[in-house]
């Protein structure tokens, strides 16, 4: 039911293209996943999302548990029926909230007690409970519960969090018995190569359908992010999809693909879109700026997304300057389509054996320009 095929490999780098088979269809890799925390990519319908070429989205177990609750979603027929999305869904475990809500939680080896950010009521999550929530949600991929420490943590604290993550993975594997849902483990270890190596080898030992690398892009320097991207893949199995969590910039995605990563997610395209910022090649344009007021060209004349096919920069400028929701939706749609177009171009370049670490297909001088 879950199978990963490597289709082509790059002779210049560790990059590869592949297909991950799930009960709700195929995911072609390398692939960016839009983030739909509450079973919605903010401001975008499922039909609009399909128009961008999205093949899998990410939702969040912690937030869906709080509202509307996994039992209601199960009653609706699972997350796919609930949100009218017939393609694959990955649910994050809530491990990131262990990091982001650190001031509101208490962590032990048994689990994490949170204060509900909505009303302050106590919420307890354990590995067993997180697995049961995700089984009720009915996602295609369930992430193991992990402890994501802050990037400023000491080596001893990161070692403790790593031990806890490994203990929780064992508990998750023991609980997770759903054959039509894949369980992915998560590699932690902070900025310490030895801890990352230990975690990668431990997580790989379970033979799970896929492996993620977490604790990246949580406030550390770009150099530290690159160190993890460069170092960890050598300890991961080559026959499983590799998911680098929380990465959405073109530079980091390019490096990660070159090192053999396959899946990525980030809130960046929609968060920036909601603030009126659009992607163009490797630039970010604030559409609110006056220079777009009388510009009747699309954001990108080479882009085939619904926004670029139908609307001008001037119209989008008008919408965002007047805080019209449609403007933020249209820019978010373009940004998602742009990232997916970028990973599609990388896939084509890998197949044509012209992918390099400085991949920039929008440049006419690029050997991979034909992929753009």
Swiss-Prot record:
Pathway: tRNA modification; tRNA-queuosine biosynthesis. InterPro entries: ArchSynthase1/Queuine_TRR (IPR050076), TGT (IPR004803), TGT-like_sf (IPR036511), tRNA_ribo_trans-like (IPR002616). Gene3D superfamilies: Queuine tRNA-ribosyltransferase-like (3.20.20.105). The active site is at residues 92, 265. GO terms for molecular function: metal ion binding; tRNA-guanosine(34) queuine transglycosylase activity. GO terms for cellular component: cytosol. Residues 246-252, 270-274 are annotated as: RNA binding. Binds 1 zinc ion per subunit. One of its GO terms (biological process) is queuosine biosynthetic process. Substrate binds at residues 92-96, 146, 188, 215. It comes from the Bacteria. Its cofactor is Zn(2+). Zn(2+) binds at residues 303, 305, 308, 334. Its EC number is 2.4.2.29. Keywords: Glycosyltransferase, Metal-binding, Queuosine biosynthesis, Transferase, tRNA processing, Zinc. It catalyses: 7-aminomethyl-7-carbaguanine + guanosine(34) in tRNA = 7-aminomethyl-7-carbaguanosine(34) in tRNA + guanine. Belongs to the queuine tRNA-ribosyltransferase family. Homodimer. Within each dimer, one monomer is responsible for RNA recognition and catalysis, while the other monomer binds to the replacement base PreQ1. HAMAP family: Q_tRNA_Tgt. Catalyzes the base-exchange of a guanine (G) residue with the queuine precursor 7-aminomethyl-7-deazaguanine (PreQ1) at position 34 (anticodon wobble position) in tRNAs with GU(N) anticodons (tRNA-Asp, -Asn, -His and -Tyr). Catalysis occurs through a double-displacement mechanism. The nucleophile active site attacks the C1' of nucleotide 34 to detach the guanine base from the RNA, forming a covalent enzyme-RNA intermediate. The proton acceptor active site deprotonates the incoming PreQ1, allowing a nucleophilic attack on the C1' of the ribose to form the product. This is Queuine tRNA-ribosyltransferase. It comes from Prochlorococcus marinus (strain MIT 9515). The gene is tgt.
